[in-house]
């Protein structure tokens, strides 16, 4: 049997698809489409894989519950080929392939996207439709997965008047249409993986609105409108889900099923997309519940709504304790030990114990507990399900990018918390070992003494110059150069000597530099002792 997304019409193929393990929508697709077209409630900017795998899938679950009846309209402001090649040929349907660490796979057709539009003035009909949607009193929320860079504001774009080319400029132009339609309320919601993401959207919108007022292009009341929290809000959120580019193994599995829409699409802008999207099973989306015109009931699909302080606590729990520090520890040592997959590292007993003990023994005593998510359950999912997942082709080399910019938040905050609470810092053994490993990593030599490619980093040349006098060899060396590294508060968040850890880290670094095999031997020694 050949299966194609375009064949799906309100579940009349359900028996055939179910035989192959494909879950079809339980709602009337055409009815939801018609209702959404007439009374739109949600527009999402960013038509990439994370949107289809997470926000759109959450809404699909809400629609399947029978307790909601509107879909989401997706708008793409950067790579318009995604709309032409991955959405419209398939009636805006897509297949979500959920990859579990057990090796099990779930396949679900996502039908919550009712329209797909190119967010640019050069596409006249699409832009006119976006203006019409923004003028609709029914519109409750616009949201984004455009990456942190998407919130950038370029001086040149601010000079383009009411036809900017960057995403935030276009959104501000559409907000101006909503202002002219009667100062209608709306919530502007970032769903990107960056701290205090709502503030990034807010700053960008305010920048455009302020400039346009200054240039006399819009009335001062427009700036007052976007700043009025009874009209426009910019809530924070925390999102966490890994959605890799389309995977060849998944592609083959779908082809073997007879699912015809299984090919990868690479756009001219080098976006990797497909009619299907593969993603990990674990996911978290926590949103500050600060809406001015109502909102879609995404809690029906598992979204957690809370206050701003709680969103911030969840972010800190993840970034400072339960996920990001473990990632960085694995990236530094994984690169030196020759690994290219995080999942493969999890089969290495030394590395697995390394991150378990960093998380549970050293970081957890000062974890920020948000109350609504259990830190122990969160880190348990990371260690037992997420990192070992063989379907997640994540590499230590990717995670090692910009390490100098990550160490302060991922480890420095824990050290500061030990200081603030008067805890005994001599209990910190493996976190110092991570930081000692960073000096060894900067040499660009693996544990066999062979060169490896160090990931890009803005401070790379500067920090490599500090460790340049050191050799990876047995025998006496002068390690005093490390003082210039480990006293840098810009890199580590604290002066490691001032907090009493510098000498311990230096001592560990000496062991790591003691010739080929020293990285493995030192790691094993300290992990076992812990």
Where are these regions (language model features)?
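Substrate/ligand-engaging "lid" and interaction regions
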Residues: 2-45, 49-530
